[in-house]
Amino acid sequence: MSCKFFHLKYFPLFFVFFVVSDVIAQQVPFTVEIEPVIAGPLPKMHSFAFAQSGSKWLFVGGRTNGLHGFSTNDSFDVIYASDVITVIDTATWSWYSSPLGVLPTAVADPLRTTNMQYTRIGDYLYLTGGFGWDSIANGYRTFPTLTAIHIDNMINAVVYGTPIALNIRQIYDTNFRISGGEMQQMNGECFLFFGHNFSGRYSDPPQPTFTQVYSNQIKRFTINDDGINLSVSNFTFLTDTNNFHRRDLNVGNVVHPDGTFGWCAYSGVFRKDCNMPYLWPINFDPTNGAVVDSSFSQTMNNYTCAMEPLFDSVQKTMYTILFGGESQYEFNPVTQQLILDSLVPFVSDISVLVHDQTGQWSQLPLQLQMPGLQGSNMKFVPNTFVPSYSNEVVKLRELSGRVLVGYLVGGIVAVVPNGHPASWANDTVYRVWISPDQVLLAVNDLKPLGQVNIFPNPANNQVTIRTNFNGAVAISLLDAQGRVLRSENRFERKDVIFNTQNLSMGIYTIQVTIGDSISQSKLVIVR
């Protein structure tokens, strides 16, 4: 659910109907490509819950128009709430739907909501919360529901037109009165990240027509389900009223350098001290809990968007591709500069978050952009035949050639970066291709041993480069054309500090040379 102040800036919408690609030299060891699926009109939708089985995709909830309105007269209009359960068969690109109106009102209303949290466990899709119209209470609210849907049985019911009610079970618990958060599961436990409880008719600027309470929590619990009886137990709560005050974010699967699994919470809105997104990520796993990493600022793709995670098992590095959405900074591929827009507009930027085995972060914008201002509340659907870990992180080193890793589905399409009237729900599916660059992977494998830390990154007035190598090291700061702007040689272990206050915003390179080996890392300068 987006809550932001807008001004109008008019730019033409540009659709790409051919394959486009990009790779950042010496940084991202793979190429990304996007191409539209040529099919008949597909359902328009965003902010839905999702599951897949074989070639079929299951969609529940969400909205069928674009960005919600900002007055009490047009915000989250009931007529644009998805009133059907939809199935798309990707083998033929045909689709089917069943109306929710056949269900009891108390069951159907939570399934018409926006920004439910959801996760899959075995044969079931579990949905929590969501914001929408409560027909019984005659008002808008966030629902306190947990719904279990048998995925295969529901898909068959929708496709063949048989009753859907037998495949739905629902219980109430106030812990689930959340929307705009994220839900994950691991080893039989579920985790409900952040979000908020919103009730009433939304308006901006705020009026006394609604109440809003942020969760400020990661809720840990167990779902007990024998296929007939549904319950929850073992709730524990991790609370942080400053760093967990987030919603409408991405929570992505990650593989740690030691091979264990976890999640990372990326950005989200809104900070308590201003109407701006959070920029620092939060790493979380069931064993170690939550670790806020304030050493890094995620400047791009700050709102819920499609994302694809990959892991390099040799370099022990996570790559997370973020597709479009809304950003505090926009990337200009011509000037190679980042441009601040405090209104956090819709963007077409695609970036890659890189988290290496030393803990160092960077965010690299690609020359490739989305086909228009889209990506917000879009879903990345993985290709289940791609070599992946059990948490759906792609095994980068096992890819060979050009690989279809998944699809981009749904989301909001905007005509202008800021302004809500001209937007709609996306009805085009895009294929996403990844081609590993074996040359760059080999170059990465030959990088000098030892840790190189660059902080802060993004930087403003100065940047520090720290290495643990005891010997001759040459450290240089290069511009986008490869020209040396700063350089220093050192012969003992100590920090090198470059003054960057006179540099323009943009993407630079830190080059570390040890003997015949060269390591390069991107540095982002912001103002």
Locate predicted features.
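Asp-box/WD-like beta-propeller blade repeats and closely related beta-sheet repeat scaffolds
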Residues: A108-N115, G132-M186
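Loop/turn-rich, solvent-exposed surfaces of beta-rich toroidal or solenoidal domains
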Residues: N301-K395
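Beta-propeller blade signature
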Residues: D74-S94, G139-A157, P205-G227, P277-G289, ...
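Beta-propeller and closely related beta-sheet repeat lectin domains
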Residues: H46-F50, R112-Y118, S179-M183, R247-G252, ...
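Beta-strand-rich domains and repeat architectures in extracellular enzymes and scaffolds
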Residues: P36-Y80
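C-terminal outer-membrane/trafficking sorting elements
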Residues: S21, A25, D445-F455, A459-R527
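Blade-edge beta-strand/turn elements of extracellular beta-propeller
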Residues: Q27-I38, W93-A106, M154-T174, F221-N242, ...
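Blade-loop segments of beta-propeller domains
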Residues: S75-G122, G132-D134
